Amino acid sequence: MAEQTLSFVDCLTSRFPTVRVSVAQPRGEITLDVPAVEWCAVCRALRDEFDFEQLSDLCGVDYLGYGNTEWDTTDVSAQGFSRGVAGKAVGRFAWGEFPSAGSNDGTQPWDVPQERFAVLAHLISYRHNRRLRVRCFASNDALPIVASLTDVWPGVNWFEREAFDLFGIVFEGHPDLRRILTDYGFIGHPFRKDFPLTGNVEVRYDEEKKRVVYVPVTSVEPRVSVPRVIRDDARFGAAAGESTHSETVK
């Protein structure tokens, strides 16, 4: 890890003792996991004390099912996702079994969050040429609530509206929290992992009523998507092997 990154991590750990600081290898990406009660205070300190003057992006994340190597779906065979996982014994995992999650380097298990919904903010410090990812988990899965950052970075207004619209995360203190992508009569939040892939209703223009109407979904066939799989990317291993081979040849 670069000395500059280590120094910055030490500064963050010293300034925010209740915040978890993690560094993703090999790129040295730094992430702060901030408790919900300290979300605004920590972000304000990052802006004022660490010169993170710009918030480039904010999004919501639904961790439902995260860490499960595979899970039961409908209308697929037991061999349907065999390219994504490797069994620990002869044969495949039986449906309903949830093997332990993989790892990012083959030694440590992935950290599976206890809470379902999180908010991620990506910050930039132009003065120090530095980027930082800040994450906050909502404590209530049924009604996820996180404080709004509009008083810290006013430009986050529409980002928070998007996260509210797509994930149902409520940003407390937001001046105008309403849907931004879906229409006003939309029911549910389409980026949640338990939202049906076909949707609930479809919209069309009714010639007789001379207006847009909602009708049950009829034009989309049910389908099964490929599940999120946590595994090592073989491309990086192959690239490392080729690099070692080239040095040996030289």
Curated annotation (Swiss-Prot):
Keywords: Cell inner membrane, Cell membrane, Membrane, NAD, Quinone, Translocase, Transport, Ubiquinone
Function summary: NDH-1 shuttles electrons from NADH, via FMN and iron-sulfur (Fe-S) centers, to quinones in the respiratory chain. The immediate electron acceptor for the enzyme in this species is believed to be ubiquinone. Couples the redox reaction to proton translocation (for every two electrons transferred, four hydrogen ions are translocated across the cytoplasmic membrane), and thus conserves the redox energy in a proton gradient.
Membrane topology classification: Peripheral membrane protein
Swiss-Prot/TrEMBL catalytic activity: a quinone + NADH + 5 H(+)(in) = a quinol + NAD(+) + 4 H(+)(out)
Subunit note: NDH-1 is composed of 14 different subunits. Subunits NuoB, C, D, E, F, and G constitute the peripheral sector of the complex.
GO cellular component, one term: plasma membrane
A single MF term (Gene Ontology): quinone binding
UniProt EC number: 7.1.1.-
Protein name per UniProt: NADH-quinone oxidoreductase subunit C
Location of the protein in the cell: Cell inner membrane
Family membership noted in the UniProt record: Belongs to the complex I 30 kDa subunit family.
Main location: membrane
